[in-house]
Amino acid sequence: MHDVEAGLHPWIAVLDFKSMYPSIMIGHNICYTTRVDPTQDIQPAEDDLIHMAPTGAKFLHQDTRKGLVPLLLEDLMSQRDEHKAGMKKAKEDLDDKALQFHDAMQYAVKILMNSFYGVFASGFYRFTHRDLGSSITAWARHNIKAIIASLEEEGHSVVYSDTDSIFVRSPVAADSISVLKEGASDEEIENWNNAKQAMVDFGLDIAQRFSKDSAILEFEKGLSVFFSHGAKKRYVGQVVWPSEEMLIRGYETQRTDTFSYLRDTMKQMFNYALADEGDDLVQYALSRVQAIKNKQVDASELVLSKSCKGKLNKDGSIDFTKHYANPDSMAQVRIARALIAKGLGFTPGMKVAYIVTDASNRPMTVEPWIEGEENGGISGYDGIFYAERLAAAIGRITEAFGWTAKELVAGNRQTSLFSF
């Protein structure tokens, strides 16, 4: 939709379309029962109201015939609104059980609503047509692009957008600060609070002005600062409204197949990035990579884990060939076999923990990490492997400050005639 602009951006209002695809289906009456088939003799009269998608597909207006799917979606959307209201009341009443119930229910309804698009866009559903799925996505793109164009005409900078969200820079005062550092003065705190309120007012105003029946825009959250190295769906920001938390999307801190040392490193680097402390960020990144390269990091912070499938035979043995074409090449399979050999037990589908001890071998040498044993029961770890993996992850961030992954591992930057 709109590629993310690399760098640091202060005071970002994040606007989100409420149940975007279901809203489009309701607003434009999209259904197999309302699609106008151009091959049929009977067509709508010239003065009949119709919905025409950007693709050219036509759907009967609600006044002519209400679609079955839009009817169902309206009921589901009403149910979700009820549960959201229940969540709000539960928060006010400090009722955790009611809050969990309504939150689970609204999420379940959301998943059910979104599944309608998946069915429409599939080829196996009997009552569908390719016009349905393509019309929904075309209207979604149209809505996003139209709002971005209007915002930019008004002089607002859109720094990023995806399927159903828009990140736009708020028109706060030019001297506004976006980062409150420890020991900030009363004047700085007041400056920051004024900027925050200006962002909230801006976000609420934009949401109200650009909402319509088929595309309800909500001011989802406000960020005091937003950072990305320029890759799609990879960004981090400091949320200050309606709650206070760090927002991380697309980076390795969100993945379950990484190791804790990497996650902790990235989180601290995000703190430096959002505070606009580029020099400290680079120095911290260098120190973390060099520490792991020189094997100065405790192995417990380098544990990797993966799920391992297998078929349990009648005799109690495990057959891995049913799930893996070449099981001996899979680290998790070799770890599972090592656990079985040690008499520690293995259940198909469970996660196994391990350490890479020598990545230069093919396949690389791994050892099971066994909690309770000294040093996890391993002989050591491959510092170069972990340093390179860490550098590859955080190098996406440090590149914005002039340092590549290779330079982080080397510990210095290469220079050329063009560097001077």
Label each region the model flagged.
Residues D48, A53, Q62-R65:
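Intein modules and their embedded homing endonuclease domains
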